[in-house]
Amino acid sequence: MKILVLGCNGMAGHMISLYFTENGHDVTGFARNKSRFINTITGDARDVGLLKGIVRAGKYDAVINAIGILNSFAEDNKSTASFLNGYLPHFLADVTADMDTQVVHMSTDCVFSGKDGGYSEQSVPDGNTFYDRSKALGELNDGKNLTLRNSIIGPDIKQSGIGLLNWFMQQKGPVVNGYTGAIWTGQTTLQLAKTMENAIANHAHGLINAVPNSSITKYELLKLFNKYLRGSSLEINPVNGVCADKSLIRTNFDLNYNIPDYETMISELAEWMKIYKELYPHYDIQ
């Protein structure tokens, strides 16, 4: 398949780009800076003329949108967040409306507040922050394009990344606190790439909560990180702290693909990270 990955240097984007390339697909990246491992077109995604020309000329099987303005940055840069999180996915859908190219968009559990939990594809987003609302605005739900809604965990090629795994891998210990009241559903970035590959090949479309059949606490997640990536060298201390249940429930099975359990996903991610260890010199992978 011929794939364009927007945001190919980000936490999700670099993994998606590398996975698709390693599995024989023709991958082009788009980012502000050149990727170290795939052919990259550099530019600003806010330059709609440039982006439209790239998408139209490339005649890709899929455009994967891995661009996102996150959390506090979205609060401080509302116009940029509105454009990239909310407008861009719909712009891409419009640009490709008369083409065979599918837009695959990444959404997040953060479109929900976490007050209730067990959110399905039919649940009405009730996130409180500007980031939450901008991501909800960007979700595509039509008969051609695909939105995969889930949280993600994975390595970051940037030491300054704000993801949970990036934070954990830089902890010196010996004790790390894990929240028992923070309920999570999602995928590793490696598994997300696999899910996308299957979805594109099988023309899945609409809005899909792309999660396993169960949830997990952040405390249990850290225990798995510790086991597979730090040689159980840290003590993970259970704490109450943050209580939020943004768990997702999948009811749309247009994507006929089962996402593995959390331990399987994290063990596979750990093996991948050990193979590509040179990408993550800021991690002490054991």
Question: Across the structure, where does each feature detected by a protein language model lie?
Answer:
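NAD(P)-dependent short-chain dehydrogenase/reductase
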Residues: 128, 140-191
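N-terminal Rossmann-fold cofactor-binding loop
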Residues: 29-35, 44-45
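NAD(P)H-binding glycine-rich loop region in Rossmannoid oxidoreductase-like domains
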Residues: 44-86
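Conserved Rossmann-fold NAD(P)-dependent oxidoreductase catalytic core, especially the SDR/UDP-sugar
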Residues: 90-126
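Amphipathic terminal alpha-helices
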Residues: 260-286
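Mid/C-terminal beta-alpha module of Rossmann-like enzyme folds, strongest
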Residues: 193-245, 277-286
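N-terminal Rossmann NAD(P)H-binding glycine-rich loop of SDR-like oxidoreductase domains
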Residues: 3-23
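Glycine-rich NAD(P)-binding loop of the Rossmann-fold in SDR/ketoreductase-type enzymes
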Residues: 76, 80-91, 125, 129, ...
